[in-house]
Amino acid sequence: MAQEIKFGTDGWRGLIADDFTFDNVRRVAGAIASYVLKNERPQHGVIVGYDARFASPRAAQIVAEVLAEAGIPVKLANDYTPTPAVSYAVKHQGAAGGVMVTSSHNPWNWNGVKFKGSFGGSATPAIMKKIEDELAAAAAPKGTQAKIEEVDLKKEYVKAVCAFADMDLIAKTKFKFAVDAMYGSGRGVLTGIFAERGVHCVAIRQELNPLFPGINPEPIEPHVAMLQETVVREKCDAGLATDGDADRIGAVAEDGSFVDSHKIFCVLLRWLLERKKWPGDVVRAFNTTRMIDRIAAKYGRKLHETSIGFKYVADLMMEREILMGGEESGGIGYSRFLPERDGVLNCLLLANAMAEEGKTLGQLVADLQHEFGPHYYGRLDLHIPDEMKENAIQRARSESTQSLGKYKVLKKEYMDGVKFFLDAPTNGNGAEAWALFRASGTEHLLRLYTEASSKELVQELLVTGEQFVRGSA
């Protein structure tokens, strides 16, 4: 009996040799082929890329073969490739879609498949539903054998991101950066750009190592410890990191402190609105900082909130002009470039913001906290049985739950999980406290997110939230 294949917020992922098998890759590729044949212009072909994980090159070859056997021409990456490079090629070559073999920031023993729409971004929920519906087919479609062409997907992409940022200004200011590829498919890309432009950088974890020794390729603490140490030791002005497939960003300030994706989003948003004055609305996911709301309000920009997953942000980018959209996990995109998150581009734009403001990353973050009030954020991943996970969500939704620890629940929201807004101290103009409980649909996992006006309050809410989930509070 065939294993069930479940699509999450960004495609399909599974454990290598358990769920992620070459047979299942063929099934997913067959479903994608059927979708393209029925809904897109198959003669325009599909772009296929892959990251630096175990089995990624072979899995990408299998995807290419299934598509070609269905009569769909394929351009297959000739090397490990950032996900946004695949999306860029899809849009600018007019392809019918793109496939990226990756498990993004997951541990070393995972892999997966992402599908990119013909517009050059994360497939919308409607597209993903159509692909899922095709999984039930007994066999992949067959057609007149099409050509598989191996191509360099990085060259034109690198030109494009360099044109989008002011590389001359970055080079002129003489800031020094530490650059961490986390052994992912962004290895050599950002460091190559900096080297060509004469930007001083210190490179770490650029080599190929699919075991990701000691880390998950996710640019958050504790996985950025080596980057933090490097920034301090080498006296860098900032540390820049990309995840396993280089579509997400993480950063470190000059003192070695971690700068989360929320602060990165806010630094870039404020810079774009204050300096660049680009048009468009602002989009954030349900689990992101509400400092974004304050910045958008100051500059008179409309704010949209979406469910969690960049595909929902991309969906909105298809409907209207979006200056900037992002999610909690470090995915940030811009309509005027691509309706896609891009770790490499955001690293360049962060360096650009530092250069134009003449300030280190830590100084830019401090400016935010001063102007818009102290905002601190925390996340806790609880690997628990499904029964406990479901029970916690039911209790959170229950009308009888009117407090979290010693704090009264002022209101609840249910867009994606259950969010409590809490009667907790704001320390003047600081963040209004909230806690979000969200159960994973594909893993034995419940994530707890919280924001508050102090680090201490964030930690208190994480502890109290975990006690609530486990039934001890």
Per-segment meaning from a language model:
Residues 1-2, 15, 111-234:
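Gly/Ser/Thr-enriched, mixed-charge loops and adjacent short helices
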Residues 1-70, 96, 146-177:
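An N-terminal, well-structured beta->alpha segment
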Residues 34, 38, 42-110, 162, ...:
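N-terminal small/polar loop signature for handling phosphorylated ligands or for N-terminal nucleophile
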Residues 78, 133-159, 253-326, 333-334:
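Proline/glycine-rich low-complexity loops and linkers
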Residues 115-118, 250-254, 334-335:
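Short beta-strand-to-turn element immediately C-terminal to the catalytic PLP-Schiff-base lysine
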Residues 124, 203-205, 257-276, 343-352:
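Gly/Ser/Thr-rich active-site loops/lids in small-molecule metabolic enzymes
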Residues 238, 278-451, 456-473:
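Phosphate-binding and adjacent anionic-ligand microenvironments
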